[in-house]
């Protein structure tokens, strides 16, 4: 296991055909032949390919989403249930972290009395024995670029992932499975619970993120959006 820097990440993706998967239900509007043809497949947080769901019902989405995962991108909080064994089994060779291993700023809200929402160091203390492959952790300065692009709101993991990949200048970046939680679900079929965000002055603003993501296709000719994002 090695911790790698931003230049390593840029070299890793540059010139490659890359597919990045969010976990909105529309990620299933794909087929495995198309997805498996990409050089690198990036999946976010609690992605689903094949297994047993939270309701103890087995699922198999391989015919829709492919069966390979080359890169896992996550904020790696306690809600991320993927184990190192899960990721290794799926073929992950690079982990990319959304958050810096640093304290950002004071952030006191009712549901977050310990201010953990803007101090990411506890995430990494809990994960100190987790890392098993090349791992990228952004600097505070890089993270704040995305925070500032949303006028002082916390970026979602998907938004940060897409912007990180855009900076790497791949040959193609196919973006699928992102809907800004419009359908009310994530992890393909689980309800999105965002009650705390309504009371958080720096909480997510997915509508603004979706507007930005859709606009990327007009600035970068290597961006390819899925059917839902293109509408």
Model-derived regions: residue spans:
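Metal-ion/cofactor- or nucleotide/acyl-coenzyme-handling active-site neighborhoods
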Residues: 1-231
């Amino acid at each position: 296991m090695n911790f790698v820097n931003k230049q390593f990440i840029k070299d890793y993706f540059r010139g490659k055909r890359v597919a990045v998967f969010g976990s909105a239900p529309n990620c299933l509007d794909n087929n495995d032949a198309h997805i498996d043809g990409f050089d690198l497949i990036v999946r976010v947080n609690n992605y689903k390919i094949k297994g047993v769901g939270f309701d103890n019902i087995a699922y198999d989405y391989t015919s829709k989403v492919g069966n390979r995962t080359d890169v896992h991108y996550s904020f790696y909080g306690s809600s991320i249930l993927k184990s190192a064994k899960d990721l290794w089994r799926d073929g992950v060779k690079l982990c990319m972290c959304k958050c810096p291993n640093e304290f950002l700023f004071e952030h006191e809200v009712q549901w977050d009395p310990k201010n953990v929402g803007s101090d990411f160091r506890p995430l990494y203390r809990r994960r100190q024995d987790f890392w098993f492959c090349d791992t990228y952790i952004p600097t505070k300065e890089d993270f704040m670029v995305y925070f500032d692009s949303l006028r002082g709101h916390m970026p979602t993991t998907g938004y940060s992932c897409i912007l990180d990949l855009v900076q790497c200048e791949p040959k193609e970046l196919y973006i699928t499975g992102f809907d800004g939680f419009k359908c009310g679900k994530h992890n393909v079929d689980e309800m999105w619970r965002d009650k705390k965000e309504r009371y958080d002055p720096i909480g997510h603003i997915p509508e603004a993120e979706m507007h930005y993501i859709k606009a990327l296709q007009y600035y970068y000719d290597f961006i390819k959006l899925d059917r839902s994002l293109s509408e």
